[in-house]
A protein has these predicted regions:
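Binding/recognition "hotspot" determinant
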Residues: 1-238
Length: 238
């Protein structure tokens, strides 16, 4: 049991980051990678799990699960489940050159990746209960609440929404060739110089929704609000 009779319960995250740098961004050949992620709180038990706060309960990218018991969250001033984020920022460029006796060629490529992904919270148990006080709201975003036998959410207002992930990707490829040329036409030989360039570019901007999932595998799913229930891009099942 985790009880804060007059205060709040905040299950936050710890941010981690990883960097990889080769060359300068202005160099024809370079690789820069920055990755970030969050590590949330994990609570697991075979029996009952209870979190009770006289204030609010906030859980970000948290996993709370009872394998055979009841998981209950009581927040007098409200309960909020939300997603954490993991990101990727990559810039990479390569260039290859080759030279022969009368010709030369070069191939270059540039890659860019900017990813911002949602990683939701999850709550599970044989039975799951989320209960807010008369003046408290329940907000669930990009997260899942799944029980084996019964799932119940009660509060003043209940809001269930999706979290967004965005992926920006671009690639650019270019091939250049140059060199001397020779031809024979009607017995006349001629020589010259030629230069060619071919380019290919691809860009993608993709937004994906991570739906919230509220349900029970074998029993009932109950949402009871004194005022309003608002669901957007959510899956409710029983």
């Amino acid at each position: 049991r985790l009880i804060a009779r007059s205060g709040h319960i905040d299950l936050g995250t710890v941010a981690t980051a990883k960097h990889e740098t080769h060359g300068s961004l202005s160099d024809a050949g370079h690789r820069h990678v920055h990755q970030s992620a969050e590590t949330g709180t994990a609570i697991s038990a075979a029996g009952d799990i209870t979190l009770a706060a006289g204030g609010r309960i906030r859980a970000r990218q948290s996993q709370i699960d009872s394998s055979a018991g009841r998981t209950a969250l009581y927040g007098t001033q409200g309960i909020q489940l939300s997603e954490g984020r993991q990101t990727l920022d990559l810039s990479e460029a390569t260039r290859d050159k080759s030279r022969g006796l009368i010709s030369s060629s070069s191939r270059s490529a540039r890659y860019s990746r900017q990813h911002d992904e949602a990683v939701g919270s999850s709550i599970g148990g044989r039975e799951v209960v989320l209960a807010a006080g008369k003046e408290g709201d329940i907000l669930v975003r990009g997260s899942s609440i799944i029980s084996d036998e019964a799932t119940t959410l009660t509060g003043r207002n209940i809001g269930i929404a999706a979290a967004q992930s965005r992926y920006l990707d671009s690639e650019f490829h270019q091939t250049q060739k140059s060199g001397l040329t020779a031809s024979l036409s009607d017995g006349v030989a001629s020589a010259g110089y030629s230069k060619s360039r071919q380019s290919l570019q691809h860009k993608a901007d993709i937004t994906r929704l991570s739906e919230s999932q509220i349900g029970s595998l074998k029993g009932n799913t109950t949402l009871a609000a004194a005022e309003q229930i608002d669901t957007r891009a959510a899956t409710l099942s029983a």
